[in-house]
């Protein structure tokens, strides 16, 4: 049995603490050291790849950048790193989700992994109509 390790892309900005996970914290808030710029996220992704991580988890939610768009852009600055894209199936149609996933897989040479989530914060779920 081999172990595979994944990293995390801080698409709401990065800081010294992991408490709170970034949920509901605006980019640039107190404690956030680096905003979630494409340049910084590219740096994180390339570092994870160089260190041998298999994939990078990319969160979804109103509090962070769009996981699909960010990871699609990051495929251009990485070679092997896979992207574990979190998405909520109730927010977009199944047909569109399938098309997005197929396009991503084709253009990234098979580097998409999906993390189907239901959400976990009641205020955000209400805002999305759950």
Predicted regions and their residues:
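Active-site nucleophile and cofactor-binding loops and adjacent substrate-binding regions
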Residues: 60-63, 85-93
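N-terminal beta1-alpha1-beta2 module of alpha/beta enzyme domains
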Residues: 1-78
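Short, well-ordered alpha-helical packing segments
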Residues: 45, 72-75, 88, 98-105
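Conserved catalytic cysteine-centered active-site region
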Residues: 78-84
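Flexible, glycine-rich active-site loops centered on histidine and acidic residues
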Residues: 2-34, 93-130
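Hydrophobic residues within beta-strands of alpha/beta enzymes
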Residues: 56, 83, 112-114
